[in-house]
A protein has these predicted regions:
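Metal-dependent catalytic neighborhoods of phosphoester/phosphodiester hydrolases
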Residues: 64-73, 89-91, 226-233
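Conserved beta-strand hairpin/beta-sheet module of binuclear metal-dependent hydrolase folds
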Residues: 1-43, 131-147, 164
Length: 267
């Protein structure tokens, strides 16, 4: 059994849970502890089953509650050295993870985390550091790519390998261009170290997906500069225009910003 659920995806808070029958891991903990407890109770999960926390980067919407979970449940926190330092310097993280539960990861170096084999890889973003994760369980490859400034060659290879993929589709280019954000913020989002547009996400998928890919989740949609239906239609149009080979056919969903999605079985 290998399952996945999104508990929040967007600037209001990001948190994802991957689990097997023996326990699971959280990817980012950017939602409040009361919200996390409520969601776990709703789905019949136990916070005592969380064996690891993987952190992508040190922005508040990804790490706000990482120290609370680590302290209260004795959960080790995996992140790069720069991200660990960023967490300790982030005033939004009021409770810091215990030093004895810090685990340092190095991009490109695989490690075991409970039942899972995990490989972090670099993703360009304007944080202290940022990584995606390739997570393998029983031969199934799950990849997480969030807060993506642009798609690198290394990321393209992981897209090609993935059976299941979470990838950012943050903004619609026209909505951002015509929206109320100041010029400096618009440039920060779109300059290659900010976030990934719907069009860039769709292009990466139709260009690099293989027959291995079974399902995609579009994550971290902007509330101001995107809409779930726009993200969906952009990918659907790209798939039609590319005329994908018949052996490549994957499902996809758009993850909700503030409420959990359904539990997906990864088979």
């Amino acid at each position: 059994m290998f399952q996945f659920i999104s508990l929040g995806s967007g600037s209001s808070g990001n948190c994802y849970y991957l689990f097997s029958e023996h326990g699971g891991l959280l990817i980012d903990v950017g939602i409040g502890i009361r919200t996390l407890k409520k969601h776990f109770q709703t789905y019949g999960f136990s916070l005592n089953d969380i064996q690891q926390i993987l952190v992508t980067h040190d922005h508040a919407d990804h790490v706000k509650t990482v120290g609370v979970v680590s302290n209260d449940y004795g959960v080790p926190v995996y992140a790069t050295e720069k991200v660990h330092k960023g967490i300790f310097n982030n005033f939004c993280v009021h409770k810091k993870p215990p030093v004895n539960l810090l685990r340092h990861v190095i991009p490109g170096t695989a490690f075991k985390a409970g039942d899972f084999e995990v490989t972090p890889f670099t993703i360009p973003h304007d944080s202290s550091d940022n990584v995606g994760y390739r997570i393998v369980y029983d031969g199934i490859v799950f990849c997480m790519m969030t807060d993506v400034g642009h798609v690198t060659d290394e990321m393209k290879a992981y897209i090609a390998e993935a059976n299941y993929l979470v990838i950012e589709s943050n903004y619609d280019e026209d909505m951002l261009r015509l929206g109320h954000y100041p010029k400096r913020l618009k440039e920060r989002i779109s300059n290659g170290t900010g976030h990934l547009s719907n069009a860039a996400c769709a292009n990466a998928l139709v260009t690099h997906a293989t027959a291995r890919l079974r399902h995609v989740w579009l994550c971290h949609l902007s509330e101001e500069n995107n809409h779930p239906e726009l993200a969906r239609k952009t990918l659907e149009q790209a798939l039609r225009e590319r005329e994908m080979p018949s052996e490549i056919h994957f499902g996809f969903d758009v993850l909700k910003r503030k409420v959990p999605g359904k539990v997906y079985s990864l088979e």
